[in-house]
């Protein structure tokens, strides 16, 4: 028995229903159905805002060499993090990475801080360079919020709400929404 959770926008039953009525299921078709049902990025006339369902073709730009990529804000180290660092260094000393550049938020307030940073500093260029790769920066204009959703620190609904509120005032480009 699966319990519905706010960590997903759709329930298993909703997805099963979609699969049951689709001869050829595609994620693009499912997303279209979800947008219609939820009203996310939909106009009052029932059509998608921006005139089309997908802007994927606009999300494949090459990253310019001279582009400035905003650095994530520093997350304050908690007492819990301070206690865990020596344990991590001992148990995982042969693994890549360092606790010296620990950037993960460990509480809700810091996750919201990272969301706000993404929305204000990265979201407008996210779409343009969504598929770009760079050896010096593996996050680029992505939000890096997935771990926090997976840990239950923030919900997809809250993220969508905050981004759309910002978009009303500051107009994020459609391929970034």
Regions from the language model: what does each represent?
Residues 1-104:
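Beta-rich, aromatic/charged-enriched effector core domains that present basic-aromatic interfaces
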Residues 59-177:
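Catalytic cores of enzymes that engage adenine nucleotides and/or redox cofactors via long glycine-rich
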């Amino acid at each position: 028995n699966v319990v519905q959770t706010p960590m997903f926008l759709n329930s298993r039953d909703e997805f099963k229903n979609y699969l049951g009525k689709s001869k050829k299921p595609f994620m693009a078709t499912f997303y279209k159905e979800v947008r219609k049902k939820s009203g996310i990025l939909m106009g009052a006339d029932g059509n998608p805002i921006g005139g089309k369902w997908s802007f994927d073709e606009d999300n494949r730009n090459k990253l310019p060499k001279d582009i400035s990529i905003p650095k994530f804000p520093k997350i304050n180290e908690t007492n819990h993090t301070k206690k865990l660092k020596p344990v991590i260094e001992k148990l995982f000393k042969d693994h890549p990475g360092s606790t010296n550049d620990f950037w993960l938020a460990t509480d809700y307030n810091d996750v919201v801080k990272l969301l706000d940073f993404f929305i204000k500093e990265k979201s407008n260029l996210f779409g343009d360079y969504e598929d770009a790769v760079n050896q010096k920066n593996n996050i680029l204009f992505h939000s890096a919020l997935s771990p926090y959703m997976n840990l239950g620190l923030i919900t997809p609904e809250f993220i969508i709400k905050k981004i759309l509120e910002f978009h009303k005032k500051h107009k994020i480009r459609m391929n970034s929404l």
